[in-house]
């Protein structure tokens, strides 16, 4: 006579068992579509920008192949790239892509910051200069101090601010080095 296996009964009331997280099929499809779109953004990058993104060898080969393909073959390759993304952590890739895409915004923000610092230097003088040189010790204190005084005189006399532009250029070189 054959032995019967005892059926394992799942106790829904037992809190010691692992919590099961159910994911809907629609959510899985949305995630897959997001990864496919991420792959498409990466495929559309130039080679120089592509080198800035941390990709493993198989993924890089798949992306380079997708850049050469057209129409339906490209669509299938993008599906494959999305599948490869499902097996890895994509956060470092997304962060690198965001840096590349937002480079213009970052530069604009930095230029606005430089302009704000320049305005503070002309308004507050030596106090603002000391704060600036604490943050950026490579700055030329004497030259900046002379330019600040010249800019303040030009401002008082309502002359075109040649010294202000020179301060701006010095700060741009100083702050964009970092």
Curated annotation (Swiss-Prot):
GO terms for cellular component: cytosol. This is Dual-action ribosomal maturation protein DarP. Member of a network of 50S ribosomal subunit biogenesis factors which assembles along the 30S-50S interface, preventing incorrect 23S rRNA structures from forming. Promotes peptidyl transferase center (PTC) maturation. Belongs to the DarP family. Keywords: Cytoplasm, Ribosome biogenesis, RNA-binding, rRNA-binding. Transmembrane segments: none annotated. It comes from Haemophilus influenzae (strain 86-028NP). It holds the Pfam family DarP. NCBIfam families: PRK05255.1-1. It comes from the Bacteria. GO terms for biological process: assembly of large subunit precursor of preribosome. CDD domains: YjgA-like (cd16331). It is found in: Cytoplasm. GO terms for molecular function: ribosome binding; rRNA binding.
């Amino acid at each position: 006579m054959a032995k019967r296996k005892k059926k394992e009964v799942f106790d829904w009331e037992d809190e010691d068992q692992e919590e099961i997280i159910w994911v809907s099929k629609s959510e899985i499809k949305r995630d897959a579509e997001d990864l496919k779109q991420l792959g498409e953004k990466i495929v559309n990058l130039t080679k120089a920008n592509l080198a800035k993104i941390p990709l493993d060898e198989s993924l890089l080969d798949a992306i380079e192949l997708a850049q050469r393909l057209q129409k339906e073959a490209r669509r299938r390759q993008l599906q494959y790239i999305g599948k490869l993304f499902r097996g890895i952590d994509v956060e470092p890739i997304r962060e690198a892509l965001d840096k590349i895409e937002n480079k213009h915004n970052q530069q604009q923000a930095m230029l606005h910051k430089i302009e704000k610092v320049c305005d503070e230097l002309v308004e507050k003088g030596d106090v603002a200069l000391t704060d600036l040189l604490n943050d950026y010790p490579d700055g030329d204190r004497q030259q900046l101090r002379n330019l600040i005084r010249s800019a303040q005189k030009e401002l008082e006399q309502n002359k075109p601010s040649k010294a202000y532009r020179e301060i701006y250029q010095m700060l741009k070189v100083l702050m964009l080095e970092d």
